[in-house]
Amino acid sequence: MTNFLIVVATVLVMELTAYSVHRWIMHGPLGWGWHKSHHEEHDHALEKNDLYGLVFAVIATVLFTVGWIWAPVLWWIALGMTVYGLIYFVLHDGLVHQRWPFRYIPRKGYARRLYQAHRLHHAVEGRDHCVSFGFIYAPPVDKLKQDLKMSGVLRAEAQERT
């Protein structure tokens, strides 16, 4: 039971970690170089942004190895990171960005809220003034729309296009 709780706790900590990395590194001056590819239209199977997943996979692989040899708790933490990575792949890459061979757009419930929240994240050009940086948790869509409206960024972008 303890190992299961370690995995669940790690998934929750990974959501906080992913939010922080997404908000302050990927959308900051340090990480925008990789993440920018995710906010641009393209027809490639992969994006430079996918390197972030590779970084977390390397960390998990190291933790699996160290956990197997010296500190078993690290193995379970690595498993939690891997579970989070799978959830991320299904929800973000699959559901939201349709990076799988079939198309599915959720019509209601949690999946719909997650889908809409991340679409609103992409409603802004560039790295500033975006909303909704988590991947498993999404704030209420009405609040995100209000935040975007209050920022004035959508009006400014609409005026630039005319």
From Swiss-Prot:
Identify the InterPro entries for this entry.
BETA-OHASE-like, Fatty_acid_hydroxylase
| Alphabetical keyword list | Carotenoid biosynthesis, Oxidoreductase
Q: Which GO terms describe its molecular function?
A: beta-carotene 3-hydroxylase activity; iron ion binding
Q: Which Pfam family, giving just one, matches this sequence?
A: FA_hydroxylase
- Known catalytic reactions: all-trans-beta-carotene + 4 reduced [2Fe-2S]-[ferredoxin] + 2 O2 + 4 H(+) = all-trans-zeaxanthin + 4 oxidized [2Fe-2S]-[ferredoxin] + 2 H2O
From its record, what is one biological process in GO terms? carotene metabolic process
Q: Which residues form the Fatty acid hydroxylase domain?
A: 8-135
Q: What class of enzyme is it?
A: oxidoreductase
Write out the pathway annotation from the protein's UniProt entry: Carotenoid biosynthesis; astaxanthin biosynthesis
Q: Which domain of life is it from?
A: Bacteria
- EC number annotated for this UniProt entry: 1.14.15.24
- What does the sequence similarity comment in the record state about its family? Belongs to the sterol desaturase family.
Summarize the protein's role: Catalyzes the hydroxylation reaction from beta-carotene to zeaxanthin via beta-cryptoxanthin.
Output the PANTHER family linked to this UniProt entry.
BETA-CAROTENE 3-HYDROXYLASE 1, CHLOROPLASTIC
* The protein's name in its UniProt record: Beta-carotene hydroxylase
In which organism is this protein found?
Paracoccus sp. (strain N81106 / MBIC 01143) (Agrobacterium aurantiacum)
